[in-house]
């Protein structure tokens, strides 16, 4: 079987009873069962239909750029059927598509998605940041909710194609330091009620403008969740990027904003384990009682938090560049369960150094305050608006994303001039 061939085995059979839901593991299981193959997702077959009603690019100061509703001229779509596999992918004008009211996604949350950005570099080039990681995570999420599998390299190619076509117009070279937000999404479209594995699905990829969310004046203020409000739990699906993780969190988020906070700091269990901040991963810099500087974040092993691409990158860069640093005090990366009690104690003892949230949307956002059980915990920020470690990490990532540093994570897209 070729690497891109897709087995007829339904995805739920692949993942049931298997704790290893990595993209590689899913593909290996699919490729080894000897079942007949269906048509694979194949980006080389992409058809292209250019829009006849091109949109006007909004000015840099146009408020429409500060919401995520203004999309570029085109989108990529591809349908899937259990009997035939993947159809021919299409690049076509952005606009509505039709699904039936009985479509699986509308009733049973058979939906997963990714979020990544296309960056206009200071050298004039268009880049993606580690798109292979996003494609692999989309595959993992798809398998978790019994949607079809695919070769991740083909999804990556389709993402690049959309950026290549629309990037030059909507992210011109004059917009150095700006970005477009990309949203690959996979939905179950079978038009039949009933809790069952969808026999039809659709992949689509769109690009929109998005506001800069990492520069909250004074730092982000977080409201710690209550014991009776849980975002994710061991054995659940908090590790997968599925829509069902986000809708149920909106009520708590709305309450946090009503009270003057930016996001919810999601806790778990009676011990108030720290997990995520809003829809972002969360890091704490604190000095241990033994005097060692540590960068602490929740682990992936219990599958409560998302394996964020930014999170993964932060950990890798810190291990490579800060464990023996001369510019900043060397710091140890620690992935473990930790609690709000530890943060409170560190704050009281002067050992709490910094906190930050990170993800594609919020990038690297410093945290200045956490409200926990009636008490405001002030988080130090050495430079007034951002801490030293947070700032250093943010600069490293910006340099890679926008081409100031030549790095394999910054993937150049050969754009098609308009």
Give the location of each predicted region.
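A short glycine-leucine-enriched loop at secondary-structure breakpoints
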Residues: 260, 307-309
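Glycine- and Gly-Pro-enriched alpha-helical subdomains that act as flexible
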Residues: 273-305
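Nucleic-acid-processing active sites and adjacent nucleic-acid-binding tracks
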Residues: 311-314
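Conserved alpha/beta cores of soluble small-molecule-handling proteins
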Residues: 2-263, 267-273, 316-418
């Amino acid at each position: 079987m070729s690497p891109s061939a897709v087995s007829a085995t339904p995805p739920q059979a692949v993942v049931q009873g298997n704790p290893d839901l990595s993209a590689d593991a899913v593909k290996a299981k699919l490729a080894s069962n000897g079942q007949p193959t269906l048509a694979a997702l194949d980006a080389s077959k992409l058809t292209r239909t250019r829009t006849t009603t091109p949109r006007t690019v909004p000015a840099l100061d146009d408020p429409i750029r500060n919401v995520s509703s203004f999309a570029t001229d085109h989108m990529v779509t591809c349908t899937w059927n259990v009997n035939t596999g993947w159809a021919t992918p299409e690049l076509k004008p952005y606009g509505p598509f039709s699904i039936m009211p009985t479509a699986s996604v509308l009733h049973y949350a058979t939906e997963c998605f990714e979020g990544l950005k296309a960056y206009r570099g200071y050298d004039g080039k268009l880049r993606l940041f580690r798109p292979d990681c996003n494609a692999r995570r989309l595959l993992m999420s798809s398998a978790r909710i019994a949607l079809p599998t695919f070769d991740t390299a083909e999804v990556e190619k389709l993402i690049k194609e959309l950026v290549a076509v629309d990037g030059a117009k909507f992210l011109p070279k004059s917009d150095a330091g700006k970005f477009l937000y990309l949203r690959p999404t996979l939905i179950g479209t079978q038009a039949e009620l009933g809790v069952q594995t969808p026999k039809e699905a659709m992949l689509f990829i769109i690009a929109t403008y998005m506001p800069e969310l990492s520069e909250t004046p004074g730092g982000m203020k977080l409201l710690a969740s209550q014991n009776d409000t849980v975002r994710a739990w061991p054995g659940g699906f908090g590790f997968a990027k599925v829509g069902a993780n986000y809708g149920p969190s909106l009520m708590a988020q709305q309450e946090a904003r009503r009270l003057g906070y930016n996001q919810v700091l999601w806790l778990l269990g009676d011990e108030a384990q720290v997990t995520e901040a809003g829809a972002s991963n969360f890091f704490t810099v604190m000095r241990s009682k033994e005097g060692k500087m540590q960068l602490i974040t929740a682990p992936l092993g219990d599958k409560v938090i998302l394996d964020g691409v930014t999170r993964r990158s932060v950990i890798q860069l810190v291990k490579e560049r800060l464990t023996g640093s001369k510019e900043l005090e060397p710091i140890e990366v620690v992935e473990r369960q930790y609690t709000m009690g530890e943060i409170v104690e560190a704050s009281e003892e002067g050992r709490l150094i910094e906190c930050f949230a990170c993800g594609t949307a919020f990038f690297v956002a410093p945290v200045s305050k956490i409200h926990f059980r009636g008490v405001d915990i002030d988080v130090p920020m050495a430079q007034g608006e951002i801490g030293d470690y947070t700032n250093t990490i943010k600069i490293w990532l910006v340099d890679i994303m926008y081409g100031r540093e030549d790095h394999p994570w910054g993937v150049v897209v050969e754009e098609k001039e308009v």
